[in-house]
Amino acid sequence: MNGTEGPNFYVPFSNITGVVRSPFEQPQYYLAEPWQFSMLAAYMFLLIVLGFPINFLTLYVTVQHKKLRTPLNYILLNLAVADLFMVFGGFTTTLYTSLHGYFVFGPTGCNLEGFFATLGGEIGLWSLVVLAIERYVVVCKPMSNFRFGENHAIMGVAFTWVMALACAAPPLVGWSRYIPEGMQCSCGIDYYTLKPEVNNESFVIYMFVVHFTIPMIVIFFCYGQLVFTVKEAAAQQQESATTQKAEKEVTRMVIIMVIFFLICWLPYASVAMYIFTHQGSNFGPIFMTLPAFFAKTASIYNPIIYIMMNKQFRNCMLTSLCCGKNPLGDDEASATASKTETSQVAPA
């Protein structure tokens, strides 16, 4: 084995020279230079500075403006809430531990940090699944008279939390475990060991199949059908130009969210699967640290995409920030089709 396994950790460094210490007790500067830990802390500080205001602003603007409280926006707000969980439950912890060079909060703190990071990521993934299904039902109309309403949105939000908890909670109760990963300053699922005492192998397989592969299949199926339907409707002119444009804009926004999710999380998932299927292979702490920390950027890209691609929300945000006055004037604010309201478009 090219790493050192302890009772509640796995350090990707051989202990032949006897330098390996518990990541809960002493700085891990034998894994990387102190300045590299400082860089991680600076990166986490940047994510906190960007992630908290932009996600809080998303919630605040939606609460302040009643016209933004549409069923589709419930799912988008769910993403903002999940991102705030990651900021407060994960990023602040990782910032502090990176400054100290090891996970100073012990195994209990590791469980909490790993839980919040996993919970936030899974809520994001399952929210994209719900959005994909919503787009499929609204645009493709497999049920001709179906309208995506408030009750459906609430059920969708509840579903994302149930599925996310089904992934994030088991390591807290004995099925797998959370351990420090990479440079030992943040925690995640144990992909490094089989750990039969906690049935680690079965949990990792369950997680990759149920909480990554199946959601991806659903998302790609829905958008494959959706692209075909949009092209067909455009060719046959089955709906008004305004409706088609609104549907396309919402669909484009959600597809971009999916693409950014894959950009953020696919490297982490790929490296985790490689480590799990090549246990005992030689890899350094940076190998897992970079994708793990890069995945954390997911907390800021969704609200940015939402603000940039949703004209109605952008105008409401400017109105809130400018004390009730929109500096762009009333013309843009009264633009016809709101992208977040297209989930209520009746079937043609």
From Swiss-Prot:
<dbReference type="GO" id="GO:0007186">
    <property type="term" value="P:G protein-coupled receptor signaling pathway"/>
</dbReference>
<feature type="topological domain" description="Cytoplasmic">
    <location>
        <begin position="225"/>
        <end position="252"/>
    </location>
</feature>
<dbReference type="GO" id="GO:0016038">
    <property type="term" value="P:absorption of visible light"/>
</dbReference>
<dbReference type="InterPro" id="IPR027430">
    <property type="entry name" value="Retinal_BS"/>
</dbReference>
<dbReference type="GO" id="GO:0060041">
    <property type="term" value="P:retina development in camera-type eye"/>
</dbReference>
<feature type="transmembrane region" description="Helical; Name=7">
    <location>
        <begin position="287"/>
        <end position="308"/>
    </location>
</feature>
<feature type="modified residue" description="Phosphothreonine">
    <location>
        <position position="336"/>
    </location>
</feature>
<dbReference type="GO" id="GO:0030867">
    <property type="term" value="C:rough endoplasmic reticulum membrane"/>
</dbReference>
<feature type="topological domain" description="Cytoplasmic">
    <location>
        <begin position="134"/>
        <end position="152"/>
    </location>
</feature>
<dbReference type="GO" id="GO:1990913">
    <property type="term" value="C:sperm head plasma membrane"/>
</dbReference>
<feature type="modified residue" description="N-acetylmethionine">
    <location>
        <position position="1"/>
    </location>
</feature>
<feature type="transmembrane region" description="Helical; Name=3">
    <location>
        <begin position="111"/>
        <end position="133"/>
    </location>
</feature>
<keyword id="KW-0862">Zinc</keyword>
<dbReference type="GO" id="GO:0009583">
    <property type="term" value="P:detection of light stimulus"/>
</dbReference>
<dbReference type="GO" id="GO:0016056">
    <property type="term" value="P:G protein-coupled opsin signaling pathway"/>
</dbReference>
<feature type="glycosylation site" description="N-linked (GlcNAc...) asparagine">
    <location>
        <position position="2"/>
    </location>
</feature>
<feature type="lipid moiety-binding region" description="S-palmitoyl cysteine">
    <location>
        <position position="322"/>
    </location>
</feature>
<keyword id="KW-1133">Transmembrane helix</keyword>
<dbReference type="InterPro" id="IPR000276">
    <property type="entry name" value="GPCR_Rhodpsn"/>
</dbReference>
<feature type="short sequence motif" description="'Ionic lock' involved in activated form stabilization">
    <location>
        <begin position="134"/>
        <end position="136"/>
    </location>
</feature>
<comment type="function">
    <text>Photoreceptor required for image-forming vision at low light intensity. Required for photoreceptor cell viability after birth. Light-induced isomerization of 11-cis to all-trans retinal triggers a conformational change that activates signaling via G-proteins. Subsequent receptor phosphorylation mediates displacement of the bound G-protein alpha subunit by the arrestin SAG and terminates signaling.</text>
</comment>
<keyword id="KW-0681">Retinal protein</keyword>
<dbReference type="GO" id="GO:0071482">
    <property type="term" value="P:cellular response to light stimulus"/>
</dbReference>
<feature type="disulfide bond">
    <location>
        <begin position="110"/>
        <end position="187"/>
    </location>
</feature>
<feature type="topological domain" description="Extracellular">
    <location>
        <begin position="1"/>
        <end position="36"/>
    </location>
</feature>
<feature type="topological domain" description="Extracellular">
    <location>
        <begin position="174"/>
        <end position="202"/>
    </location>
</feature>
<feature type="topological domain" description="Cytoplasmic">
    <location>
        <begin position="309"/>
        <end position="348"/>
    </location>
</feature>
<keyword id="KW-0807">Transducer</keyword>
<dbReference type="GO" id="GO:0097225">
    <property type="term" value="C:sperm midpiece"/>
</dbReference>
<protein>
    <recommendedName>
        <fullName>Rhodopsin</fullName>
    </recommendedName>
</protein>
<dbReference type="GO" id="GO:0042622">
    <property type="term" value="C:photoreceptor outer segment membrane"/>
</dbReference>
<dbReference type="GO" id="GO:0007602">
    <property type="term" value="P:phototransduction"/>
</dbReference>
<dbReference type="GO" id="GO:0050960">
    <property type="term" value="P:detection of temperature stimulus involved in thermoception"/>
</dbReference>
<dbReference type="InterPro" id="IPR001760">
    <property type="entry name" value="Opsin"/>
</dbReference>
<keyword id="KW-0966">Cell projection</keyword>
<keyword id="KW-0472">Membrane</keyword>
<feature type="transmembrane region" description="Helical; Name=2">
    <location>
        <begin position="74"/>
        <end position="96"/>
    </location>
</feature>
<dbReference type="Pfam" id="PF10413">
    <property type="entry name" value="Rhodopsin_N"/>
</dbReference>
<dbReference type="GO" id="GO:0097381">
    <property type="term" value="C:photoreceptor disc membrane"/>
</dbReference>
<feature type="topological domain" description="Extracellular">
    <location>
        <begin position="97"/>
        <end position="110"/>
    </location>
</feature>
<dbReference type="GO" id="GO:0071800">
    <property type="term" value="P:podosome assembly"/>
</dbReference>
<dbReference type="GO" id="GO:0005911">
    <property type="term" value="C:cell-cell junction"/>
</dbReference>
